[in-house]
Structures are given as C-alpha cells and as structure tokens.
Amino acid sequence: MAIYLFKITNKHRKSIWRKIEIQETQTLGDFDQKIRESFGYDDDHLSAFYRGKAWSAQGYGEIEPGGQGRGANKKIQDLKFQSGDKLEYIYDMGESYISLVELMDIGAEQAGVAYPRVVEKNKQRNKYCEQCKLKGKKQVAVYNVYYFEAESLEQLCEPCMEYIEEDIDATEIVY
C-alpha cells in the first residue's frame, strides 16, 4: 500500500511545520484529525482542504468537528496527488488558520506502523513571558494576549494569565 508524506507549514509562521504520513486508503477526515492533533487545534471548528489557494480554488468540502462533512470521506488515493502537489488547509473558518500542504513523497508502507502519523516536526523555539522578563525571570509563554484598545500583543505564561481581565482576547501559542 502507498504512503503519502505531506509537509504542513503554517502559512504566516513558516518555522512551524509538521510532516505527516498517511495511507492512500485513508481519508481527508483522517488527515484533518492528525493535523488538528499535531498543531493542538480544538475539535470545535470546521476545516477544509483546497487545491491551490484557499477560497479561490478547488475545495474538497468542509470537514466538521468529529470527522463528518462533505470532505471527510474523500480517500487520499482518489484525489490523484503527485509529488510536489500543493494544497491549502484552513482550520476555523472564522479565524482562518491557514497551512500550506505539500506532498513530499509517495513511498511504501512499513509493517507494524499505525497511520496517519507525525514523522517530524519543527524544533520548538520558545517565546518567553513578557511580564516575567520584567521581573528577571525566564518563563515560557503559552498565550498570545491581544489588547484591542491599545492595539498591542503580549505573550504570557500560565501564572501571569491569572491577572488578566476576562474580556481580553487570548489564544494558545502553537509551537
């Protein structure tokens, strides 16, 4: 059975990527679930794959949380991908987290291996909490906090988040 090796790269932060292998008989729903797991995405938003650029190219259908939707049951082998083919993957249609997806290689299945699987990922480059830096501490930041009125962004650790107002927009940092 053929195994497809894809590289999935965050469109706006190219230093964040994963390489995922998937069997030809598995589906875009299976692929979507592995991407969600590997990037730490929740299971509460729609996603979709597009051949070429997102929104303006051939889409394969939306994938709902839990693996349902028009695009979920499309088998990898039926999409006729060739090495070098490029897709765009969108997670969360509102926020539009866009990743570039490139087919790197088509190889043979390894016995005893469970697919899909992450075979490689970027080296983690930690960002550090800005509040802790001011206190002379070095604590890994886990949240991007956006202050709308000041139009500023701050990266904070878990303990410093306890002192932030509830109506502030905060998202987890993906490493």
What positions do the PLM features span?
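Short linear regulatory motifs enriched in tryptophan with gly/pro/ser
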Residues: 1-175
